[in-house]
């Protein structure tokens, strides 16, 4: 889907930061996150586990424990800053204007309520539907997400369903409020390849039918490349590269993005061993000064020990790593 750059953003995230309270004091988990989301646009958030993708997504709706977290920056939805809204107004937006499909539905769905009751709860809250009217609409939603024999299965409990069916129920709950933005946090986790493809096809169809914007969180670059218009690559709590999905895949600017792409297996390559990125993401309390990727980077320079702001470039792209010459080698 091609999105006009002149379209006013639906969501604007500026200087977002998230800190968590620990026994040793406050620890920063995410910082310097900036992005926009246009109507009907899909943005992919990608990176290794621990890069800050889910922390970023949960913060958009202030879903972190308020006693042990603190948020900085702003998240504006249609001009309203979600970080300063009264709780009553925020509840109106959650699920209705902005909805979320969480990871691992077996731990998200209530095991003692039927799936019908859980869908009807959102219909009552956001549309005022009750009784038979709510049940009828819940069955329609199950049909829409392709649950077979929805009129019978609406009275089943989550444990009676497969992983793929539970994820479809989560999607039905999410779209019950007719949201303008859907946040899908690793929607295909723990599903086999065939079911993954079915879930992504379902999300694609719903996105187009309901004219939703989507924030897709995934470590699967191939999946994001087929679904998203733009991508934001995150590493150690910061975005390191953003841009149109085709540009990021064809001409990555940041060494971390290059490393992720090179680790994707190619059926045409005859390799005994896949390329890997040495090392691992540092813990939040042990992040290096300057470029956080420098200790793992094969192109690290002496200047990388200094803080690296993200630089806006042409074509809607941005990178935290300055353009380098082909002959440059690591000097650290």
UniProtKB/Swiss-Prot annotation:
Regarding protein family, the annotation reads:
Belongs to the ABC transporter superfamily.
Assembly mode:
The complex is composed of two ATP-binding proteins (BAB2_1052 and BAB2_1053), two transmembrane proteins (BAB2_1050 and BAB2_1051) and a solute-binding protein (BAB2_1049).
For this protein, the Enzyme Commission number is 7.4.2.-
Q: How does it sit in the membrane?
A: Peripheral membrane protein
Q: Which InterPro entries match?
A: AAA+_ATPase, ABC_Ni/Peptide_Import, ABC_transporter-like_ATP-bd, ABC_transporter-like_CS, Oligopep_ABC_C, P-loop_NTPase
Which Pfam families does the entry mention? ABC_tran, oligo_HPY
Location(s) in or outside the cell: Cell inner membrane
| GO terms, biological process | peptide transport; protein transport
Xref: PROSITE patterns: ABC_TRANSPORTER_1, ABC_TRANSPORTER_2
Q: What is its main location?
A: membrane
Top-down, what is the taxonomic lineage of the species of origin?
A: Bacteria, Pseudomonadati, Pseudomonadota, Alphaproteobacteria, Hyphomicrobiales
> In its UniProt entry, what is this protein called?
Putative peptide import ATP-binding protein BAB2_1052
Residues involved in ATP binding: 47-54
Q: What does the protein in this record do?
A: Probably part of an ABC transporter complex that could be involved in peptide import. Probably responsible for energy coupling to the transport system.
Top EC class per UniProt? translocase
Q: Which key words tag this protein in UniProt?
A: ATP-binding, Cell inner membrane, Cell membrane, Membrane, Nucleotide-binding, Peptide transport, Protein transport, Translocase, Transport
